[in-house]
UniProtKB/Swiss-Prot annotation:
It is found in: Nucleus. Residues 185-195 have a biased composition (Basic and acidic residues). GO terms for molecular function: DNA binding; DNA-binding transcription activator activity, RNA polymerase II-specific; DNA-binding transcription factor activity, RNA polymerase II-specific; RNA polymerase II cis-regulatory region sequence-specific DNA binding. GO terms for cellular component: chromatin; Golgi apparatus; nucleoplasm; nucleus. Belongs to the ETS family. This is ETS homologous factor. Transcriptional activator that may play a role in regulating epithelial cell differentiation and proliferation. May act as a repressor for a specific subset of ETS/AP-1-responsive genes and as a modulator of the nuclear response to mitogen-activated protein kinase signaling cascades. Binds to DNA sequences containing the consensus nucleotide core sequence GGAA. Involved in regulation of TNFRSF10B/DR5 expression through Ets-binding sequences on the TNFRSF10B/DR5 promoter. May contribute to development and carcinogenesis by acting as a tumor suppressor gene or anti-oncogene. PROSITE patterns: ETS_DOMAIN_3 (PS50061), PNT (PS51433). It holds the Pfam family Ets. The keyword Nucleus applies. Residues 29-115 form the PNT domain. Residues 183-202 are annotated as: Disordered. Expressed exclusively in tissues with a high content of epithelial cells. Highly expressed in salivary gland, mammary gland, prostate, and lung. Weakly expressed in kidney and colon. Not detected in heart, brain, placenta, liver, skeletal muscle, spleen, thymus, testis, ovary, small intestine or peripheral blood leukocytes. It comes from Homo sapiens.
Length: 300
């Protein structure tokens, strides 16, 4: 498969297994296995004890390390905890995730029998060291941050296309193409960006997607490790945890099926408005356009 960035990746599960670390022992019982989603990071806990949020973190890690687009793994099919995940057969993984199912199954089996409670667990088979992303504190804190919940009475996000179908095509074909994006009725109705207020301060609780993204960037203490500035002066930013951002947005919109693929397609509606721009050749990198308000330092 040829990725958007021009690299080549083989989804043969034999080529994507992790290097052989020490086997799981009774020591995993000393890891934090709390039933809540503050139960530690997923790579510190035996998969049997993962919460559904740690399952999603594991899926996000596979997306990042294999340079796959978010639509390749339908997160809504894995709204389950680790015990349920570990009980799934290869056939069930394939039904849930299509072509990527075999990769998920093989990786999980490797973690179950060869994992360890360690943060420096991963190494690819292509002589590239893959470091597990760390956040301080864990980004899962954002799921329970009641002080940063947006109002949910401003419409619902349009569900766009079947991500599983798109992913099968992406993995099986040697070239990647983007599906056409339909015009969103909600975006057609969206009003022009508000004029700068007299106090020169932006609205801290944005109601549109681009404002939601902006406010995450402007409140890193409340939302650590999700998105970061690449070039603040130019308005360039990068998604660090794309699926976590999508799930947080879905929670605000009462849409449990939200994925980064759907979120990124919704972001495209702002291109014509010159509110957001895609940075060519850089995965997960965007910038604010000339009509975006409230992100510049001199506006705060």
């Amino acid at each position: 498969m040829i990725l958007e960035g021009g690299g080549v990746m083989n989804l043969n599960p034999g080529n994507n297994l992790l290097h052989q670390p020490p086997a799981w022992t009774d020591s995993y019982s000393t890891c934090n296995v709390s039933s809540g989603f503050f139960g530690g990071q997923w790579h510190e806990i035996h998969p049997q004890y993962w919460t559904k949020y740690q399952v999603w973190e594991w899926l996000q890690h596979l997306l990042d390390t294999n340079q796959l687009d978010a639509n390749c793994i339908p997160f809504q099919e894995f709204d389950i905890n680790g015990e349920h995940l570990c009980s799934m057969s290869l056939q069930e993984f394939t039904r849930a995730a299509g072509t990527a199912g075999q990769l998920l199954y093989s990786n999980l089996q490797h973690l179950k029998w060869n994992g360890q409670c360690s943060s420096d667990l991963f190494q690819s088979t292509h002589n590239v060291i893959v470091k597990t992303e760390q956040t301080e504190p864990s980004i899962m804190n954002t799921w329970k941050d009641e002080n940063y919940l947006y109002d949910t009475n401003y419409g619902s996000t349009v569900d766009l296309l079947d991500s599983k179908t798109f992913c099968r095509a992406q993995i099986s074909m040697t070239t990647t193409s983007h599906l056409p994006v339909a015009e969103s009725p909600d975006m057609k109705k969206e009003q022009d960006p508000p004029a700068k207020c007299h106090t020169k301060k932006h609205n801290p609780r944005g109601t549109h997607l681009w404002e939601f993204i902006r406010d995450i960037l402007l409140n890193p203490d409340k939302n650590p490790g999700l998105i970061k500035w690449e070039d603040r002066s130019e308005g360039v930013f990068r998604f660090l945890k794309s699926e976590a951002v999508a799930q947080l947005w879905g929670k605000k919109k009462n849409n449990s099926s939200m994925t980064y693929e759907k979120l990124s397609r919704a972001m495209r509606y702002y291109y014509k408005r010159e509110i957001l721009e895609r940075v060519d050749g850089r995965r997960l990198v965007y910038k604010f356009g000339k009509n975006a308000r409230g992100w510049r330092e001199n506006e705060n």
